[in-house]
Amino acid sequence: MDTIVLDQRGEVFSFFRSLDMLCYAIIAQQYFQDPTVLLLLLKVFVQLSYLTPKPFSQLNALPLFYPLLLNFLISLMVRMFFNLPTAGESLDGYLYGGSIINFIGEKNESSRIDFITSDLVLFCLQIFMALILIASNKRPTQASHIQASQSGLSNVDGDEEPSDLITEDSRDTQQGQRQEDLQRQLENERSRLIARFSHSLYSFQHGLSFGSPQNRNTPLQRQSADSYSTPVCIEVDSEDWKDLVWKSQYATENANTNSINNSPLSSNTTGVPNSVLTNPI
């Protein structure tokens, strides 16, 4: 079960990273058509600050919608009220960049619709990434709150000692057990990756054969769907849209528990560090 959870989070991260690279590609393409350095720096700053995947929680107190909307409105005003870029006769009608050198020239655009359409596509893609970011960070936070409430009820109903009376020896024992669980999980993942690499290497070496005792698949045949993990599904509901426009309650909760969740010795039900579960992307 832990392996499937890690595989699903890896798929979400890969998908989110692909969307991030697509946004940077659109920004670069816009700069090739309109070599304005200020617009380039503004778009890269917004994308890098709010949407690019990072190893820590990206939900801030400020909603993600307003920086993205401000970026789009500034670009729209520049397209509407300023002249289009022009290339001189010496450059044969091609733009080769401004302060940043472009070795491959772009044909001079004669219509503002192309620029506005490109800005609109970038804005919609960034909104989609923000919704995925909010929805993916909301599920682990809700699960952690449910787990904390259940543990609190068990501590009240049971005969456990108060937290003030826990000795240092018991804390050291719990930390040692958590380290052993984490080490066991890492060993299992390492063994699984080594086995997968060995199987891939064997298939690559015997790919030209029609079959082998260990691999009966033809070189271009896909494996069955049962051999893969269940595809991850992120649902975006009306609450996610509200969190996109208004202040997200999960941003405050993640900020308050950031120091606890970043600890590799924090306990959880899967044996994976809470920093991985709290920040899936």
Curated annotation (Swiss-Prot):
GO terms for biological process: protein ubiquitination; SREBP signaling pathway. It is found in: Endoplasmic reticulum membrane; Golgi apparatus membrane. It comes from the Eukaryota. The chain crosses the membrane at residues 22-42, 62-82, 84-104, 115-135. Residues 145-154 have a biased composition (Polar residues). Residues 145-183, 256-281 are annotated as: Disordered. This is DSC E3 ubiquitin ligase complex subunit 4. It comes from Schizosaccharomyces pombe (strain 972 / ATCC 24843). The gene is dsc4.
